[in-house]
Amino acid sequence: MRNTESHNREGSNPKEILVWDWPTRAFHWSLALSFLGSWITAEAGLEWASTHMFLGYMMLSLLLFRILWGFVGTRHAKFSSFLVSPRVFLSSLHNLFSRRSEDHMGHGPSGGWATVLIISVLLVQAISGLFISDDIFNDGPYHGSVSDGVASFMANLHHLNFNLILCLVALHLSAIGWFQFGKNQALTKAMLLGKKKGPAVLGIKSSQTLKALSIFSACASIIWLIVWLAPEPVYLF
């Protein structure tokens, strides 16, 4: 792992360059909407259970895509561009609450590890949902494939992990607000439009659209296949 790329606004003659490819941006907002939708449908009642499950499958497809894109995607989307060593991460913390603006073209050290953490907890949430039941009408596709003890563990994990996700989302939004207004870094605009100010040499030339669409199609197909291959539940009356 190596340190993230940053630049000093002064003396670098910055101009707007493409940093975030559109597949990364589409992933970000699609994941946010899928999570919001899954939260709403979970609270809305049993009649929304099918939609809730579909959104879970969508989240799995998106997360699998982002993991693969983190290895073969564009420059700043790759994990290798923003995951730093623990030593570098700890040494960067003293700048986190400083108003001094040190722009990173991609994720900074804290943002990089926060990205991995959020992906991880959402992955746990989506996977655990495959094994649980509402005990009335709807079962996850693999609920009948595990013992009652495992299903109960997955259900508890699903509900407890959701509370952790809410805490991380609140922390994430607070951090964005701090960087936006306290450190004067337009992170939301960058994730919407894909552009930041910096030296042209640090920008990306394209979003690698064909590669991204191929990978996402493969990921969605894999998740569909996993669900389709789930064994039929056996009901004992």
Stretch-by-stretch model annotation:
Residues 1-237:
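Membrane-embedded alpha-helical bundles that constitute the cytochrome b-like, heme-associated redox core
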